[in-house]
A protein has these predicted regions:
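Periplasmic-binding protein-like
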Residues: 75-82, 127, 145, 149-191, ...
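Extended ligand-binding regions for polar small-molecule ligands
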Residues: 18-27, 86, 93, 99, ...
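Short helix-initiation/N-cap motifs at beta->coil->alpha
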Residues: 18, 33-44, 87, 104-107, ...
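Ligand-binding cleft/hinge of the Venus flytrap
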Residues: 5-9, 21-30, 92, 105-125, ...
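Hydrophobic/proline-rich hinge and linker segments of small-molecule sensing/allosteric domains
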Residues: 1, 69-91, 104, 173-177
Length: 208
């Protein structure tokens, strides 16, 4: 569950990632079947053939490239989310000494842990971080840009993006390490989806 990218809506999994993967599957002549897996077990399941691909807002990092093949499908920033009543923080460095909530095993967690004297709380589910902020148990959240934008739009009286953390970074679809034929096929489909405007149409549906 990571709206607007992917979430379970009364038994139906939907979102930007879902529409994009459905389009890729269609161009490969297959039908995508989706399952929900805990975040920190995603690459493990992939390595033992529990599923063929992972699309879950996964930043492409050197460490992950050692574990899996990755096909870039988007780039985005990490953003800082705070209460509208708080003194706004616009950079990672300005979070020094503050209480930061993040999802475990994410780029956001790595960034939070790099902040001097920060009190970092890591949670299994990203939505817990928003509850922590809502209830005043943290000063800020570091989260993927699309999710921060979604919650700011959903509840502007509770959440506001005050700044960014780091540079815009690539996000990828993960395939089993060595699954080069499937990786190449998905890369080709992704290139076509970007070239013919389909990627923009899917993006506009969920983010505009």
């Amino acid at each position: 569950t990571y709206p607007p990218l992917e979430w379970n809506d009364n038994g139906t999994i939907k979102g930007y990632d879902i529409d994009l993967m459905d389009e890729i599957a269609s161009r490969l002549g297959v039908e995508a079947e989706f399952m929900s897996i805990k975040w920190d077990g995603l690459l493990t399941g992939l390595s033992v053939n529990q599923y063929d691909a992972v699309i879950s807002s996964m930043n492409i990092t050197p460490g992950r490239l050692e574990e899996a093949n990755l096909v870039e499908y988007m780039q985005w920033l990490q953003v800082i989310v705070m209460s509208p009543d708080a003194n706004p923080v616009s950079t990672l460095e300005e979070l020094e000494g503050k209480r930061i909530a993040v999802q475990v095993s994410t780029t956001s967690e790595e960034m939070a842990n790099s902040v001097k004297d920060a009190q970092v709380s890591s949670f299994e589910s990203f939505d817990t971080t928003f509850m922590e902020l809502k209830n005043g148990r943290c000063d800020a959240i570091i989260i993927d840009e699309p999710v921060g934008m979604y919650y700011q739009k959903l509840e502007p009286s509770l959440f506001v993006i005050t700044g960014t953390a780091g540079e815009r970074a690539p996000v990828g679809i993960a395939l089993k390490k060595g699954a080069n034929a499937l990786t190449d096929a998905i890369q080709e489909a992704m290139d076509d989806i970007k070239a013919d405007g389909t990627a923009d149409r899917i993006y506009d549906k969920w983010f505009k």
